[in-house]
């Protein structure tokens, strides 16, 4: 059986890891052993934060809706209850966008909600 020399595959593997570590500071970007650890850790952070991002954006949308609703005399929970009673099925992302960029449209939704809550 011939002897297997791994120069080509090792070089390719090193190049791949160092390419992923491009832009890292210090030896994390140019020493394979350290770059490999840094790339692994970066992947763990990326995996974790793709899930965290969903929670963070939901919190942001709720905070924006709450602030806009309070300006018009309702709390977030009252507003959410009124939306359900009025059968308005707009998600939080769209409501937050309306609250920030189209105050008139958000105001009309709040008026519909207030009417349903009063009835």
Swiss-Prot record:
InterPro entries: Ribosomal_bL20, RIBOSOMAL_L20_CS, Ribosomal_protein_bL20_C. One of its GO terms (biological process) is translation. SUPFAM superfamilies: Ribosomal protein L20 (SSF74731). GO terms for cellular component: ribonucleoprotein complex; ribosome. Gene3D superfamilies: 6.10.160.10, Ribosomal protein L20. The keyword Repeat does not apply. One of its GO terms (molecular function) is rRNA binding. Keywords: Ribonucleoprotein, Ribosomal protein, RNA-binding, rRNA-binding. CDD domains: Ribosomal_L20 (cd07026). Binds directly to 23S ribosomal RNA and is necessary for the in vitro assembly process of the 50S ribosomal subunit. It is not involved in the protein synthesizing functions of that subunit. Belongs to the bacterial ribosomal protein bL20 family. This is Large ribosomal subunit protein bL20. It comes from Acidovorax sp. (strain JS42).
């Amino acid at each position: 059986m011939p002897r297997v020399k791994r120069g080509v595959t090792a070089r390719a593997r090193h190049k791949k890891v160092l390419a992923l570590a491009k832009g890292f500071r210090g030896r994390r970007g140019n020493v394979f052993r350290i770059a490999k650890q840094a790339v692994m850790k970066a992947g763990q952070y990326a995996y974790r934060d793709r899930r965290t991002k969903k929670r963070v954006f939901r919190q942001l949308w709720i905070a924006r809706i709450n602030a806009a609703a309070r300006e018009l005399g309702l709390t977030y929970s009252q507003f959410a209850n009124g939306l359900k009673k009025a059968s308005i099925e707009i998600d939080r992302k769209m409501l937050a966008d309306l609250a920030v960029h189209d105050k008139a449209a958000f105001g009309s939704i709040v008026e519909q909600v207030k009417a349903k809550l009063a009835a």
